[in-house]
A protein has these predicted regions:
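Conserved N-terminal structural module of periplasmic/extracytoplasmic solute-binding proteins
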Residues: 25-75, 82-101, 110, 114-116, ...
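Hinge/lid segment of periplasmic solute-binding proteins
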Residues: 443-498, 515, 627-634
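Extracytoplasmic "Venus flytrap"/periplasmic binding protein-like
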Residues: 403-472, 597-605, 620-623
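Extracytoplasmic/periplasmic substrate-binding proteins
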Residues: 572-663
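Mature extracytoplasmic/periplasmic domains
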Residues: 229, 319, 332-333, 345, ...
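C-terminal capping/gating helix-and-loop segments adjacent to ligand/active sites or protein-protein/ligand interfaces
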Residues: 643, 702-769, 773
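Helix-loop-helix "hinge/cap" segment bordering the ligand-binding cleft or interdomain interface
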Residues: 177-179, 183, 462, 482-588, ...
Length: 777
């Protein structure tokens, strides 16, 4: 057996290059008190793989995995073509072939024991060869360990032959014994199945009786075969049911996964070959779960749910075994986690963030007093995004004294209430249980900041030489984000959201009133509409008018101003739009698309979401000689534009290590981390300025509604227009609480239903909102 070189099983300290040492509590993920035991990871690098791990399974205390390895020189034959791209044939009409010796990466199967030793090639398996002269690929789509150390491998072949114009696809089931001898093979291809279709097998499992189950996702069925490949029967799902996967329970029974009919979550069904139907649902996983699989350790299934690694015994409640990130493991890198018979959590991962390579990680339960303690800072969030996850991992690996422990409240979401986690987090903060660091997505920061729960970050920015004080940042954005001169959160990217219109009609200076918008519309051709097709009154109110609702509330002083006339104007603006839009009567051809409507004067304004510069010059070209002005939303102060962002990072006023917390959250302002701009325009001034400099004069290629390729140039005038609007924008969207939004929407419905005037609705909102806002102080 070909032994693969591996490193020793090491507990790597923070001072080593990978810096992957950590401890994570075996109690509920995110618990702040030190638990009696923590998981300590031991890393084994898997050498000899040409790439990362692709598939992983477990059975009988061993792990099976697939990865690519470098093959020796292979003689490949290819169809030869002439200079015009036509296939060459000989005098007999046969294809002329050419030969080439190449080295390729090919799929291979490996096994290793759960203790981390004995990584070895499963020598019996080598990828199937395509027919001679064929061009295509062979994919190792699934593997399943069998009783006694055997293996079932499922390959998908896709290829074409020179003498044929048809593209062939088939699936090949191959069965091996523990010594690697191939004992059976069966091909499923066109003509081998009912209806002549080639099945699309995408998952495989095996039961205690030695039966192998193949999931045909396209055909909506699960096919059972015996150890020789002979068909035993099939179970079909109904037409409305989509098969997601298979797994084998601890008792050796096979279960199928399907989406919950009511949406969200995964249902688990026993497979009943006798009735040829899926059995009743035996358990339902949360909509947060990433599919179940055979995970070992006496559990029926394991799965990931957000940052949590979970295990399930059918008939009992799922167990959250650990949080990947609190073990300093990037959940995005985990191929699969397993549980050993001794209770250790194992995972196979591909190290994308470090030096590369694949690893087996054993997370060993260890008494907490045997692990070097660190001071912990808590970070709370409702979903952990990729950038923050990566920053937490980097901080924890490099800092010898402090670590950040993540509490992801999305774990409390349910199929009945997707917002349960956010509600719990918001309630806890309101009650005074504030984390050291907060990811602010969805959090009513206006009311919490007014209560003094979070720290002003301007002093930290001014004292940080890395950024050059306030001048080192895009100040208009952060000034708009500030409350009464205090900045409570920072972020690495933002979007400029505005309306664009023809300069010849709306003028050249951004910012206008509702009356000015109506006057401009009167100048447009008869029948011209304000926005693109499909907008209704309620949609305009929810998506456009709501952008500046936060400006009607002063949370600190408990003052509302919905009754000043501006809010009533906002409601009356929606009268320009229909109650309902009749999509059945619409023309969806390019001639009725937004671009054609703007060019022909049938649409006055275009919504702009400027989070990059790539398409701006194309958008401007739509208005032709009339020119384009970023006029903004009516009634919004300043430029009429608003800033939006996906969420920020804040520090609690109660945090005892604010400087350490700042060292962490300020990663989002660092120039090196803003090259990708966090999904928007960068907030670091140097990166922001460079973005504009680099794009001036650049040719941009776009595609029109009718598919035509259009090339435009981003000019200095375009750059100046965007920057001028940014410099005069003073509003950030979405700055209101969910409860306040509900009050506004409830009262506004009376206006949309024709039961109340705009002024009546404004007065009612003023009364209810004032009571609510003062209750929150």
């Amino acid at each position: 057996m070909n032994k693969i070189t591996r490193t020793g099983s090491l507990v790597l300290s923070l001072t080593l290059a990978l810096g992957l040492f950590s401890g994570c509590g075996s109690a509920e993920p995110g618990s702040t008190p030190g638990p009696d035991k923590v998981y300590v990871p031991q890393y084994t690098k898997l050498e000899g793989l040409a790439g990362g791990i692709n598939l992983a399974e477990t059975a009988e205390g061993r792990l099976f995995l697939t990865a690519e390895v470098e093959s020796g020189p292979v003689l490949k034959k290819y169809q030869k073509y002439d200079e015009n791209g036509e296939p060459l044939t000989d005098a007999e009409g046969k294809p002329v072939m050419e030969e080439e010796s190449v080295t390729e990466n090919v799929p291979a199967v490996f096994t290793l024991d759960a203790a981390g030793g004995g990584l070895a090639r499963f020598e019996g398996y080598s990828v199937s060869a395509l027919p001679e002269g064929a061009e295509g690929s062979v994919e190792l789509a699934a593997i399943r360990p069998l009783a006694g150390g055997g293996l079932a491998a499922l390959e998908r072949l896709s290829y074409s032959l020179p003498q044929e114009e048809v593209y062939r696809e088939s699936c090949l089931l191959r069965i091996f014994d523990a010594k690697g001898a191939e004992t059976a093979k069966r091909e499923f291809g066109p003509g081998s199945e009912e209806g002549g279709e080639s099945p699309s097998f995408t998952a495989m499992a095996a039961d205690a009786q030695g039966r192998i189950f193949l999931m045909d996702q396209t055909g909506g069925r699960v096919l059972a075969v015996d150890g020789s490949g002979a068909e035993l029967g099939a179970v079909r799902a109904d037409e409305q049911t989509y098969l997601q996967g298979l797994f084998q329970s601890a008792a050796g029974e096979v279960y199928a996964m399907t989406p919950k009919p009511e949406g969200g979550g995964i249902d688990l069904h026993a497979i009943d070959l006798g009735s040829k139907k899926l059995g009743q649902t035996v358990h339902s996983l949360s909509y947060e779960a990433y599919g179940a699989y055979s995970g070992g350790g006496g559990y029926d299934a394991c799965y990931n749910e957000g940052e949590s690694f979970c295990a399930l015994r059918l008939g009992a409640q799922p167990e959250r075994l650990l949080s990947w990130i609190n073990c300093d493991i990037n959940s995005s890198s985990v191929v699969r986690g397993f549980v050993s018979e001794g209770g250790e959590v194992l995972c196979l991962l591909n190290d994308y963030d470090g030096g590369g390579g694949a690893y087996l990680v054993r997370l060993v339960p260890t008494p907490a007093d045997q692990v070097k303690p660190k001071t912990t800072l808590s970070l709370a969030c409702n979903y952990l995004d990729y950038d923050v996850r990566r920053a937490v991992l980097d901080f924890n690996r490099k800092n010898a004294e402090f670590r950040i422990e993540v509490r992801d409240y999305s774990q409390y979401n349910t199929d009945e209430d997707y917002g349960a986690g956010l509600t719990k987090l918001t309630t806890e903060i309101g009650a005074g249980s504030v984390p050291d660091i907060l990811l602010t997505n969805g959090i009513p920061m206006e009311s919490f900041a007014a209560k003094g729960l979070f720290t002003d970050l301007w002093p930290f920015i001014e004292a940080d030489s890395r950024f050059g004080g306030r001048e080192g940042l895009v100040q208009p954005f952060f000034n708009a984000l500030s409350r009464e001169g205090k900045l409570y959160e920072i972020t690495g990217g933002f979007t400029l959201q505005t309306l664009a219109g023809p300069s010849s009609v709306v003028g050249t200076q951004p910012g206008w009133s509702f009356d000015q918008l109506r006057a401009a519309l009167d100048k447009m051709p008869q029948g011209c509409e304000v926005f693109s097709r499909g907008w209704t009154r309620r949609e305009v109110f929810a998506n456009v008018c709501s952008l500046s609702l936060g400006s009607f509330v002063d949370w600190k002083n408990g003052v509302c101003r919905f009754d000043t006339g501006e809010f009533a104007d906002l409601l009356r603006f929606t009268e320009l739009f229909p109650e309902e839009y009749k999509w059945d009567d619409d023309d969806f051809s390019p001639k009725n698309g937004e671009e054609a409507r703007i060019r022909e004067g049938r649409q006055m304004l275009r919504q702009m979401y400027i989070n990059s510069l790539y398409s701006y010059s194309y958008d401007a070209s739509l208005y032709g000689k009339a020119g384009m002005t970023l006029i903004g939303y009516p009634g919004v102060p300043g430029s009429g534009a608003v800033f939006s962002y996906s969420g920020g990072l804040a520090i609690s006023e109660a945090c005892k290590n604010k400087n350490v917390a700042w060292d962490f959250i300020s990663y989002c302002l660092d120039p090196d981390n803003q090259q990708d701009a966090f999904g928007g325009l960068p907030t670091n001034k140097a990166v922001f300025d460079k973005l504009f400099r680099d794009n001036i004069g650049e040719k941009m290629t776009s595609y029109s509604d009718d598919g035509a390729e259009v090339e435009t140039v981003f000019t200095e005038d375009y750059a100046r227009s965007i920057q001028d609007v940014i410099n005069s924008t003073v509003t950030v969207s979405g700055r209101t609480s969910g409860t306040l939004s509900s009050i506004i929407n409830e009262e506004a419905e009376g206006f949309f239903a024709g039961q109340k005037s705009a002024d009546e609705v404004a007065r009612n909102i003023q009364n209810r909102a004032s009571i609510y806002v003062n209750e929150q102080r």
